[in-house]
Amino acid sequence: MNSQNYSINNFKQIFDNDILSDVKLILKDNNKELSLNLHKIVLFTHCKFFQAMFVGFEESTKKEVVLNVQNVDICRDIIKEFYGFKSPSVTRYQNWKCRLEYHICCNYFLIDNKFPDIVNINKSCFDDLLNLIDKINYNDVTIRLLAKNLPSNYDLSKLPLELVKKMRNKSCYSGFVFFGNEKHLCIADENFDNIRKFQYGIDLGNDYCYMPNSNKIVRVVSNYVANFSLQSESFECYKIRTKKFNKKFDKKYKIKSSDSFEKPIYNSLRNEIIIIHRKKKYSIICVLDAKKFDLVRTICKFKKSKEKLCHMALSYDCNKLVFVLTIINEVNNKNTEIYVKYLDTGVQERIYKTNRIVNDLKFLNNDIIVFYNNKNNSGHLKTYDISKHKKLPGLTTFPITHISICQEKYVIIVTNMYTHIMVSKKFSGIKYFENCKVVCSPSGKIVSYGNSKNFLTSIDDYENYKTLDSLEINSILPVNVKYDIHDKLNDYIDSLKKIEEENI
């Protein structure tokens, strides 16, 4: 035999070869049987499973060993890796079932491996999925996977009640979606104890909104809408189209490559997205259908030479749209005007005018807006009641860098020194928040980010906080996710409770 270079990581030439073979491994699954001529030293060196088998067990002296495995072909590929062959897991196992079986086989051989990212599973394959999960483990990840893929017409009586309850709990949750510097999106629970990461090969843009009706995150990239479903955890991209709008309203309305779309706001009442369309000579507030993202109508149009559209906000009842314009007059002086557009009637009126720049604007509740400006090293928070056309008491403080609303009653004001929390004209301070951005969940969880450190705290106990130093957060949204199947699971559990009560 010619001299060969058999390194510890390259035994390709002797895989399934009787040369120096000291063990015959017979792999069996429900459909197939395969015999391999192998070498104990190679198996022992690369795999904890075989280390245990060949030391202290009766197989250590046997020339033939039979293993009942999940998938013979996958186990053969794993063993081939021990002999120096390239891992096939990335290129070969794209089918969801094969990826789960690969995970099961790795677990069988005591090989560390991450649970695979499963995106799309045909609902008709749910029983197959259930059988595989039963061989893996019932944990947060696998139960969520089952809940996502449970068919709406599935007979729940076939499942253990405890599993149905766990799927019900995992099919509805509160948390945060955030974006880092890389091209990825992360989903975290409210306490940031469990974080899942999804990576894509395109830039997802900067402007985004959450659509709770469909459990989707929408981000705008040029004249495209990037759409991430929190239920299927899959990604789609749509081009903003004007064909239907051209036929019905304006034949000349076009979207050019130089145009941009900014600041999307979701209107849950009408299932629409309100967005700013910036063109070369003017800006338009327009409306997109939230299913296919077609342009359906326009709300307002402004000439860029005279009016700069800066900010806009939608009331919680989705009937009042407030926007901020910087007006340039004939002598080039600038004034800022705030308008309200009543979407149910189409009426538009100016509600506020100032000679200062408005840096940001939010709705505190359905009638009161909060906005701020900075001048002469001071920050000025303003509040205004739209229904009463009345200015309300505000706050003068250090220069303001960010404002956020929590539970429709708290105003969180971030300055370059520290942070105020305002409620019912009373103030308190959070000293460890400064020069940052803040987002609040409906339950009162507060995340500060954009500074050297990220923090998690609560509106009810903001003196205590959790640092999120290991996370890179550029933008973040609170989400309340409810899968389509949640109500069915809830109704089923309630019906069993009623039957049990009637039988008592």
From Swiss-Prot:
PROSITE patterns: BTB. Belongs to the mimivirus BTB/WD family. This is Putative BTB/POZ domain-containing protein R842. SUPFAM superfamilies: DPP6 N-terminal domain-like, POZ domain. Pfam families: BTB. It comes from the Viruses. Signal peptide: none annotated. Residues 21-91 form the BTB domain.
